[in-house]
Structures are given as C-alpha cells and as structure tokens.
C-alpha cells in the first residue's frame, strides 16, 4: 500500500469530515422543513427599450422548505421582440429554470421577499434563440387567502449562445398569482 503524502492525507481527512457533517445535517434539514407545495403563474416583461422587449409567461412549481425559504422549478414560454438597425425580428423560446427565494417580511396581509433564478432552453431545437438567463427579483405577495396576487420588479441577464443575438441585461416587472397548498 502506497503511503499518502501530507497534502493527500489532509484532503482525505477533509472529505471524511465533510461527509460526516453532511450526514449529521440531513436529519436537521429533514425535520425542520415546512413541507408544503406552491404554484405560481405570472407574466413578466419589459417595454423600456425599443431595441429589445422580452415577455415571458411563467409557471412555477415549488416547495416551501421553511416558512421563509422556498425553491421552484420554472417553465417559461418566452417571446423576445428585437429591433436592430431598423429591422424588426422576434424569437420564440421554451425555457426551464430553477428559482430560490426568501421571504424577508411576513405579515397576515403581505409578504415581501427576494428570489434569484437561473434558466436555460438547453439547446432545444424548437427555440429560435438559445440562451441562459440569470435573474434577481424583489416581490410582494398580497392577501390572506391561499391564492395571492404577486407583484415583482427585477433584473435579468440574457447570456446568448448564438451569434445572431447579443447578450442583454434588462429591468423587468412581473404580475401573477400564487397558490400555497
């Protein structure tokens, strides 16, 4: 058997400690979860620039990890309107994404929070524009019932994977409704 060098020894010990820590944290995470599901439907877009106007119809299916923390899987049906050098064009895309959000302020009638997200059309053949997006959004949920309207404002960066369209960053607004199960 080969003798480990000092660095290899430290790496193996660190791995062992991380695995042990992970195994100890699993019960804490499992029993501290709120364990409810959530659905969100929203429309988001921007009309601030004449050169680029993206609009997305979003459907999120998620899980409330705690009262404040949630994770969502997102599907978007997106259309982007372009006007470059006087030529108008559009691109239609289907996007799959993941969001992670945190509610900062809880009250009976209002929740205020923030979420970050990433999405990609994963090189789908039926998408005109191939891109990844990164977004950050502040939102408010209003009302006391299970179905709550949501209003949001955020920033999104489109990382284009084609030569036909360039990378873009926009400020967007969203409106929709959410259901907590």
Task: Name each region found by the language model.
Residues 1-37, 181:
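Bacterial Sec-dependent N-terminal signal peptides
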Residues 6-8, 18, 35, 44-46, ...:
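Compositionally biased, intrinsically disordered low-complexity segments enriched
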Residues 30-79, 83, 170, 174, ...:
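Short glycine/proline- and aromatic-enriched beta-strand/turn motifs that initiate or cap beta-hairpins
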Residues 34, 50-54, 89-95, 127-133, ...:
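Transmembrane beta-barrel outer-membrane domains
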Residues 48-50, 82, 123-126, 160-164:
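A generic structural signal for short coil/turn motifs at secondary-structure boundaries
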Residues 60-151:
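Gram-negative (and chloroplast) outer-membrane scaffold detector with strong preference
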Residues 131-181:
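A generic hydrophobic-segment detector
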């Amino acid at each position: 058997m080969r003798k480990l060098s000092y660095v290899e020894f430290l790496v193996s010990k660190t791995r062992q400690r991380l695995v042990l820590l992970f195994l100890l944290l699993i019960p804490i995470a499992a029993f501290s979860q709120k364990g409810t599901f959530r659905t969100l439907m929203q429309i988001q877009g921007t009309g601030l620039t004449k050169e680029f106007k993206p609009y997305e119809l979003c459907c999120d299916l998620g899980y409330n990890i705690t009262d404040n923390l949630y994770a969502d899987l997102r599907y978007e049906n997106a259309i982007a309107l372009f006007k470059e050098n006087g030529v108008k064009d559009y691109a239609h895309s289907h996007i799959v994404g993941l969001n992670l959000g945190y509610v900062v302020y809880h009250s009976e009638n209002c929740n205020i929070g923030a979420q970050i997200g990433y999405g990609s059309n994963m090189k789908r053949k039926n998408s005109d524009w191939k891109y990844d997006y990164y977004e950050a959004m502040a939102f408010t949920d209003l009302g006391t019932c299970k179905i709550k309207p949501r209003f949001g404002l955020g920033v999104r960066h489109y990382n284009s994977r084609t030569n036909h369209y360039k990378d873009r960053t926009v400020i967007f607004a969203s409106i929709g409704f959410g259901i907590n199960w």
